[in-house]
Amino acid sequence: AEAFWTALGLSIGTYLNWFFVAKRLRVYSHRIDAFTIPDFFSRRFGDNKKILTCVSAIIIVIFFIPYTASGFCACGKLFSALFGMDYTTAMLISAAVIIVYCTLGGFFAASFTDFVQSIIMTVALLIVLGLGEGLIGGFDKVFANVSQLGGYLNVFEGYDVAKGVTGNYNALTVASTLAWGLGYFGMPHILLRFMAIGDEKKLKLSRRVASVWVVIAMGIAVLIGIIGFSLMKNGIVPQYADNSAAENIIVDIAKFLSKYGYVAAFAGGIILAGILASTMSTADSQLLAAASSISENLVQESFKIKLSPKKSILLARISVVVISLVAIFLARNPESSVFRIVSFAWAGFGAAFGPVVLCALFWKRTNKYGAISGMLAGGATVFIWKFLVRTNFAGTVLDIYELLPAFIIGLAVIIIVSLLTK
């Protein structure tokens, strides 16, 4: 149930972001000559003191660190499961590789590798889906297996395979899971792509392509999860104790294939390359975005420290290393869930930036005081809800995904403060 509502929320969020935000943000940013999200906020609200730039840059660094940690964690799990290595050693080696090509190659290296890695990821997803279905003996057998579990295919109940219990998805739980879609309104790396669109006429085509692709990708991901249970039931992959362990499903499929000749082993290799590609592609993009926020938005724009091009690049490289060290510390636990780490970072960006972006584009009365207050309120609520509310009220009505309450609070604060300080 959680996978279905998350996938649906992301699909809807993608379409709405392209439909409502893309064109307005592209036109507005070109009109005020803004090239980054902190720059857009500062110029849109006439913040000459660059307070908005400073706050937004700090938020970008804070929430890109766990994003980067999730990539390191995934790489560590991959090599640990594949080669029987110690998780910490595997994670450190993976992090070192990413750090090296980010610091030496910079944005060109990340852009080129992202392009190649996206192709590998797509092929890997399709191979996993096809081979997984083939190993079970067709989709009929796949769904026959899962239908035996009460609530597994019921999106209002769900079934926890690890605990062996049927869940209950009420309206509030559904709404909070669908709230994943709200995160798109505040994702800096996605919004930057809107700002960089060259031909406005291609927006409609781009929206259609992006929306269709997300639906296909989310659909395949959900199907892989369903197939994964059947593979587990047939003894092809091990029995997983929890959601964190279940994240090794694709690795285990690849390891199983490697035992059956060169062709199967080659297919398994592509699958593993797809996992590595997805994690490295994510980690390098987040590292460079965070480093850019420090060297450009924070140091040079907010603190008014002028740097030569060489010193700016050096500072960015140092920032990559420092951010990576913090991310490595966060990723040190082999039992941590990649999905949970990503969900926290996603909520942070969605709640801190999403309401501000929407108000900046659609409500003329929004001012810099409202924007700053809303940004801080949304980001802070994510921490409070995640580590205080959900921890102390687990299993109650308050135990919902932190993005929903944080987004609502951030939006409310923007409106209230803007009206009080007009």
Residue ranges and their predicted role:
Residues 1-422:
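Membrane-embedded helix-loop-helix hairpins and adjacent transmembrane boundary segments
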